[in-house]
Structure formats: C-alpha cells, structure tokens
C-alpha cells in the first residue's frame, strides 16, 4: 500500500502541470508502483489468490490507460514507458 507521501512524490514526478493529478501518465505511474509492490508480496505469498486477482485487474487497467495514451499521443506514450522501464 502506498503512503500519502509516496503517492504525492509519484504525482509530482509525472504530472504535466501544477494541479495535474489525473492525467494518464500519473494514473499509469501510480498503478505501476502498486503493481510492483503487489508482485513483491506475491513472491513471498505464492498462494494468495485473492491478491493475484487484484493484480490482474490492475494490470488490465494499466493496459487500457496505456492503449488510450498510445492512440492519443504516441510521443507521450513512448516517453512514459521509457521513464517507467516498461516494454523491454
């Protein structure tokens, strides 16, 4: 679970302007952080299928947001996946 301070740091890093909290970039960055933390949890607790389902839902949501951003502005999409280290 992200603390309020960690969430604010991620928002500041990826926001497009001063009051931006809901742009696709910010949403994707927050989801990526939550996904990474849940992955660590699932490596320690292999039989936690409840959390695994939540992980799959988050990955699907991130996929939808990435597809939207890719169709809307390909340059912002490429910049974001480079920053987040997605797509090897």
Swiss-Prot record:
Coiled coil: none annotated. Pfam families: Ribosomal_S15. Keywords: Ribonucleoprotein, Ribosomal protein, RNA-binding, rRNA-binding. One of the primary rRNA binding proteins, it binds directly to 16S rRNA where it helps nucleate assembly of the platform of the 30S subunit by binding and bridging several RNA helices of the 16S rRNA. Belongs to the universal ribosomal protein uS15 family. NCBIfam families: S15_bact. This is Small ribosomal subunit protein uS15. It comes from Caldicellulosiruptor bescii (strain ATCC BAA-1888 / DSM 6725 / KCTC 15123 / Z-1320).
């Amino acid at each position: 679970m992200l603390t309020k301070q960690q969430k604010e740091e991620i928002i500041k890093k990826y926001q497009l302007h001063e009051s931006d909290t809901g742009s696709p970039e910010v949403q994707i960055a927050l989801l990526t952080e939550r996904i990474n933390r849940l992955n660590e949890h699932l490596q320690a607790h292999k039989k936690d299928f409840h959390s695994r389902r939540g992980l799959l839902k988050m990955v699907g949501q991130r996929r939808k947001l990435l597809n939207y951003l890719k169709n809307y502005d390909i340059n912002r999409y490429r910049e974001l996946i480079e920053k987040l280290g997605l797509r090897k």
